């Protein structure tokens, strides 16, 4: 039985590797594997990612959900206007027409990869989407949204009540200068768990 389970895990992991072969992004394989494994280990009911772009990181959650059935929510406005609100658009080279194409390509790619079975895509800003979730309803939360001090701290305040005590908060680009403040604030409600990607990603556990 254990060999059969391992075989299934490996077969599904191949979907992530396939996604990594053609979906652009900056997620290291170490992080992809961590996010795949953490779903299988912690057996969540609800997983949320904010900041999807082309979907490279959320592919791990979607693949793992085929083994351990859980709901995966991918949240991104794919909006030039939304990204311009607090100056983050300086990091964005695409116009709105290109962002629309990226959104539709993401939907198509995940259908072709067979990764959309448990996936719900929400095309809203992070703040607006936070109102769609009940308090303490999220087991794993991955934040890869706008990395300004304002946006990241607003995300922390908006989403922390939605994450279960004992739930995971995975923060991307923790090595950015503008992400220092949100990490200091996070430690008031979370405990540090681990770093990934040489400090690029930081994982917290909600303690209160």
Q: Where in this protein do the model-derived segments appear?
A:
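A short alpha-helical cap/connector motif
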Residues: 1-208
């Amino acid at each position: 039985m254990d060999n059969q389970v391992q075989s299934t895990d490996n077969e599904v992991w191949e979907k992530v590797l396939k996604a990594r072969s053609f979906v652009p992004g900056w997620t290291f394989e170490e992080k992809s594997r961590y996010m795949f494994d953490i779903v299988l280990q912690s057996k969540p009911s609800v997983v949320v990612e904010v900041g999807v772009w082309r979907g490279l990181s959320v592919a791990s959650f979607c693949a793992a959900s085929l083994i351990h059935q859980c709901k995966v929510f991918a949240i991104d406005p794919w909006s030039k206007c939304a990204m311009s609100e607090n100056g983050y658009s300086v990091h964005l080279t695409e116009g709105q027409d290109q962002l629309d194409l990226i959104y539709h390509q993401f939907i198509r790619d995940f259908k072709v990869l067979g990764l959309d079975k448990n996936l719900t895509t929400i095309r809203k800003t992070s703040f607006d989407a936070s109102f769609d979730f009940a308090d303490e309803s999220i087991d794993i939360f991955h934040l890869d949204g706008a990395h300004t001090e304002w946006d990241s701290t607003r995300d922390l305040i908006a989403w922390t009540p939605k994450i279960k005590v004992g739930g995971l908060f995975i923060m991307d680009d923790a090595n950015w200068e503008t992400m220092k403040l949100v990490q200091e604030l996070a430690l008031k409600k979370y405990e540090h768990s681990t770093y990934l990607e040489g400090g690029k990603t930081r994982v917290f556990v909600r303690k209160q």
